[in-house]
Amino acid sequence: VQGPEARELAAPCIDESHREQALQLKPFTGMDSSQSFVARTGYTGEDGFEIMLPAAVAPSVWDRLLAAGVAPCGLGARDTLRLEAAMNLYGTDMDESISPLEAGLGWTVAWEPADRDFIGRGPMETLRDDPGKRRFVGLLLEDKGVLRNHQRVVVEGKADGEITSGGFSPTIGRSIALARVAAGDYDSAQVDVRGKLLNVRIVKPPFVRNGKTRIEL
């Protein structure tokens, strides 16, 4: 259950003895109740709850959420939200062959203390210090059209990258994408859309967070 009113609307569906505790949860924390696990987490860039509960009681909780005014949404809506929030999709934006440093996830690597050892530290340090490593960036389409996965990103006439996730952003009213591109100091590029080069601006993701645009249009 995600969105600005998610916790308020979902709270009545949580066991009364644990309801207040659930409402006090900090982001990225969770709690056990008598029949469920409630976490203040999500994959949308919005605030809210993720609730795990026995299958036998799920239909009644669903009905109560509907009665409270929660609107159902499908996978397409969820995927649009996570794209606006620039949240990686495994198998699309990253996999085992992609370093966190080339997936916009460098902040997850704990380099300190300097003697902290972990599997892959050596190669990752080499990549960290490599000025030629690929960049993981956001793209904002300046022309008419829609950006899609696997379209080629072209810089100065050369195919120098690929869109990993793309689509239309209802919040921004433009097409957006995540892409892995070649190193370099440039803030614009083109994308090959069915043989036609369309202009894009390179921006720092996320595009949207908590329903508010984070980039300059």
Model-derived segments and spans:
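Conserved, structured C-terminal
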Residues: 1-217
